[in-house]
Amino acid sequence: MKEGALMRVAIIGGGAAGLICACTLGEKGIDVTVFEKNDRVGKKLLSTGNGRCNMTNLGAMPEDYFDSAEFVAPAFQKYPPQSNIAFFEERGLYTRSDSEGRVYPLSNQASSVLDCLRLECERLSVRFSCSCDVKTVEKKGGSYVVNGKDAFDKVVFACGGRASVKDFNSYSLLAPFGHKATKTAPSLVRLVTDDKMTKQLKGIRAAVSMTLCSKGKKAATESGELLFSDFSLSGIVSMELSSFVSHLKLSGKNDFSVEVDFVPEMHFEKLLSILSDLAGRSGLKSENLLSGLMPKKIGICLLKKAGISPEIPMNTLLQNQLRDITALCKKCVFKITDVGPYSQAQVTVGGINRNDFFETTLESKKHKGLYCCGEMLDVDGKCGGYNLQWAFSSGRLCGESIIRESRK
């Protein structure tokens, strides 16, 4: 009989964390059943990274997880990004990374990652119970009973969070065990604004530097692509800052705005000098003044915001008008009224209180044999592979912890 064959483990949730935990356990011969609410496992995994699956980030560190650095450190020490990459390569899935350290499957398809995990589970005789909405998990004697009928020695809660999930209620499963969820909010999602300029620029993208302010005080700065849409700011730079907005809102902060620098490569005086030179040498319409620096439509909107008609000749612009234009190029302010809804978010801020779990094993401090991993815990990271890195590392740590228990 294989090592650990007598131990039965239930994993509630067939996402990234649950599946890699199942693989880790199955490899040691442990009897594993994955319960999944959807008709198949890994549905959310298919949508990550715009369908390409940003699996991890080469530069991921515990400090990239807001106030959770100390908690996630043991999982990262045991299973850093390179370890998770090796896990997949050993099973035939090869990867590539970009200049930002983001790691993707070589196929550029999220389905390749899901197939790798699913097929490995099948090879290891992991059972899938799909279209199974787990309503109750109860402690009876030394066992955990799922939905009043199936008994297990250990249970792993890997249900994910509220982001992109309809009718999420999995936090309640842990309530009978004394585990409560913290306040939650959507993260890695668009920023909502009441500025009409966004509607005029719908679909326009620009490489910018963007600073988030709360009551006028700078809170965070990110650089990357900004995408305008109806009364919202999207793109990776906005999604990054949405995490800070959500964390700050949960801590009681409000009154948010963002300052967008459309020409981050140049300081104010250099940009003013360039614009002054361009304006002095051309009788073209002012609408063309900024077209060599940013998308033309953005330039026109900035002119109008400065109270300047795009129709007047450039060489009629006064120095104070050029200073106003330069100032808007370097700091265009948008009031932020909210972040997008859970249905559009990639990650949840908050979750089951991590302080009730041992960071070295992810086992409950309240009930032996109960574990929690992935997004279900109140851990969230930056945009760019950091949250899947946590899912994979925490799922593997849960599995390894249970394996150690099976040897006692």
What does each model-found stretch correspond to?
Residues 130, 300-380:
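A glycine-rich dinucleotide-binding beta-alpha-beta segment and adjacent secondary-structure elements
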Residues 26-50:
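Glycine-rich FAD pyrophosphate-binding loop
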Residues 8-34, 398-403:
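N-terminal Rossmann-like FAD-binding beta1-loop-alpha1 element of flavoenzymes
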Residues 39-41, 46-47, 55-59, 179-183, ...:
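An anion/pyrophosphate-binding glycine-rich loop and adjacent beta-alpha core
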Residues 12, 35, 134, 150-163, ...:
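Short hydrophobic core segments
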Residues 154-197:
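Glycine-rich loop(s) and the adjacent beta-strand/alpha-helix scaffold that form part
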Residues 130-142:
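A conserved short coil-to-beta-strand element within the FAD-binding core of flavoproteins
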Residues 50-97:
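Glycine-rich active-site loop/strand segments that organize a redox cofactor
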